Amino acid sequence: MSQPESTSQDQLPTWVESSLFKGMLRGIERETLRMQSNGFLSQGSHPKALGSALTHPHITTDYSEALMEFITPPKASIQETLDYLKDIHAVAHKHLENGEKLWPLSMPCMLDDSDESIRLAQYGTSNIGLFKTLYRRGLGVRYGRRMQTISGVHYNLSFPDQLFEALQHNEKDEALKALSAQDYRSHRYLGLIRNFIRLTPLVMFLVGASPSVCKCFMTGREHQLLPLLKGTLYLPFATALRMGRFGYQNSAQKELGIHYNNLPDYLNGLQKAVKTSYKSFSRLGLNDADGEPLQINDHVLQIENEYYSLVRPKQVPQEGETPSGALANRGIGYVELRAVDVNPYSPIGIDENTAGFLEVLALYCLFTESPELLEKEQDVIDKNQTEVVNRGRAPNATIVENGKSYFIEDWSRTYLDKMQAFAELLDHSYETQIYSKALQIMQARINEVDETLSAKMIEDTVEYGGTWSFGSYLAQKHAEAYEQHQLSKKASAYFKEVAQASLDKQEQLEQDTTQSFEEYLSQFR
């Protein structure tokens, strides 16, 4: 990536001032499995005291009934967001049943040999509830249920209107100056997304935290992983196996050619995918032997959400809008950064160092020139990601960029140096040192790879005697942190009220019987 003409290598444009960043918003989504006291995946239902997983705004489920998802609202600072996430964890932990705990690793706790023991998330008997469960059943028959037990952290980030206005005002390209505010904002967010994809190996190297897996996760799969200890497989220099071929992937999607070079093409690609049949999925059948639906349809994507990517353009949908409909109508409103492993050492799965680093990186990606991302370059990026996932901490691990090969430490250091000015700018905007401190922590990980999360995890997994023992130790430690967390009376009352309101909302949805589920489903087939 080259720098914009208006900046020197390590310098921001002269017109940039800290007030432009007032109004940035961020939100976090954190996934975590409920684990039984024996270390196996929970077979219990989502605790009713936490409300309805269908309609609760902050505590829901992802693929499995046991895979919880905690969602903060957009907040004005990193600290406020992390504090809110702590509240959610404390509430969820309080209502876990039968001695269950929250599993602290991205890669799952113990699974038995049967996929059927990975229960699909249940959302009640309304059409939308049944539809959500069927979507998950379809994912299971397409890709297997094991893959869907992996947890991650999604970091949502938006920049304020005045920043885009200033960027557009200072554009040299008259065509870009002439765009509507909405179209220009989408144009800049897409530039951010392309650059973030280019720099994803940096995220995997510095905050990757899935270098090993429980042996049970690989049941029935071919692999080249090595035994670390009894019951644990790993690669010696791996950083983020979750992001590699053992993690979530969809080979059918690779054929789509969906890209982030402009919004209309991205949306057209998505629309085509949700309407085009795919032979492998057609062969699975739409219904099982008993006539029960197996998948929503046989299309490349059952619904838009099935499209998996490391970063997503997002817009808050209004009632009745699809994600792509919201983007088409109002442009990109924020980005969702999805290449982030759960930090097992944090009770809430992420700390302020990772949050600060991601925000500086995103701002750097927004300001830096971002040419179109074409297939040839994407192939190189894919190879870079594979290198970092499998052997990012190896002494001779390399990154290829613009036809040249670099040692990963040198490559990473170059980009962190370029980001320094952006960290200082954000520190000034927020009257904090969070951002500069985050870069210092990441710099220390580059200088000494044994300081990376993935290296520490290997060391601790050996010390505690395996994935399960290490994860169980952390789960207990984090449970104590949740119990010690002081929830304010206001927050306590709010979560109680929201839980009940979500149950009432689900019941209301279930009373609407004007359309059978078969009729509802036919719209998508």
Where are these regions (language model features)?
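Secondary-structure capping and boundary motifs in well-ordered enzyme cores
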Residues: 24, 131, 147-151, 188, ...
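Substrate-recognition/cap regions that form aromatic- and gly/pro-loop-enriched pockets
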Residues: 328-329, 335-427
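Histidine-centered divalent-metal-coordination microenvironment in nucleic-acid enzymes
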Residues: 31, 147-160, 334-341
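Short conserved micro-motifs at the rims of enzyme active sites and ligand-binding pockets
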Residues: 43-45, 82, 115-116, 167-168, ...
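Terminal catalytic/cofactor-binding subdomain
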Residues: 2-140, 147-153, 184-194, 198-201
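A glycine-rich phosphate-binding loop feature that marks nucleotide/adenosyl-phosphate handling sites
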Residues: 108-109, 214-217, 378-388, 435-444
